[in-house]
Amino acid sequence: MDNRTKALNLVPMVVEQTSRGERAYDIYSRLLKERLIFLVGPIDDHMANVVVAQLLFLESENPEKDINIYINSPGGVVTAGMAIYDTMQYIKPNVSTTCIGQAASMGALLLAAGEAGKRYALPNSRVMIHQPLGGYQGQATDIDIHAREILTLRSRLNEVLAKHTGQSLETIARDTERDNFKSAFEAQAYGLVDQVLERRPDESIQAG
């Protein structure tokens, strides 16, 4: 049994009483009803497809009500992350983001991409920004092609981070040269999040 299968087997079930009797949900499906999406783990094409589908579904359910994404991710594939990013910007509902644990690399970009004023981090979470990673091997001409693609992606990611943080392109380029780790409060000062939440506000005790 691989780690993914083990993780799926550990997902709790929630049982609700309805007029037709009991109905069981896995915890993530139940929270999706409250417009909560969990972006947890490495960002790959499968995760991107699932998150994009959830965003589009919630938009169809109510295009005027906020969607909340909780992020605990080490990052992952740039194109997969940008699929989520583009969908967040495309749909009508405001998308709030909250970092729990860590938001690194593409996870940090998606955290910053939440609706302005609705981007949060919990106090002990960590945020890390850096440039896209290379490592392609092959013929020299192919390596050159991939190197140019990485530079193109880096330029675009820097533009996105600058847009959402308010930092200059020069600052973003300098600060992403190497892995750049930040505490929740440092991420707030940098413009990656708007507020560090130590407790849920009293008026929003219910899920969502």
UniProtKB/Swiss-Prot annotation:
Gene: clpP
Cleavable signal peptide: none
Keyword Cytoplasm: yes
Chain's role: Cleaves peptides in various proteins in a process that requires ATP hydrolysis. Has a chymotrypsin-like activity. Plays a major role in the degradation of misfolded proteins.
Protein name per UniProt: ATP-dependent Clp protease proteolytic subunit
Subunit structure: Fourteen ClpP subunits assemble into 2 heptameric rings which stack back to back to give a disk-like structure with a central cavity, resembling the structure of eukaryotic proteasomes.
GO terms, biological process: protein quality control for misfolded or incompletely synthesized proteins
Subcellular localization(s) per the UniProt record: Cytoplasm
EC code: 3.4.21.92
Active site, renumbered: 105 (nucleophile), 130
HAMAP family in UniProt: ClpP (MF_00444)
Gene3D superfamilies found in the cross-reference section: 2-enoyl-CoA Hydratase, Chain A, domain 1
Species: Stenotrophomonas maltophilia (strain K279a)
Catalytic activity entry: Hydrolysis of proteins to small peptides in the presence of ATP and magnesium. alpha-casein is the usual test substrate. In the absence of ATP, only oligopeptides shorter than five residues are hydrolyzed (such as succinyl-Leu-Tyr-|-NHMec, and Leu-Tyr-Leu-|-Tyr-Trp, in which cleavage of the -Tyr-|-Leu- and -Tyr-|-Trp bonds also occurs)
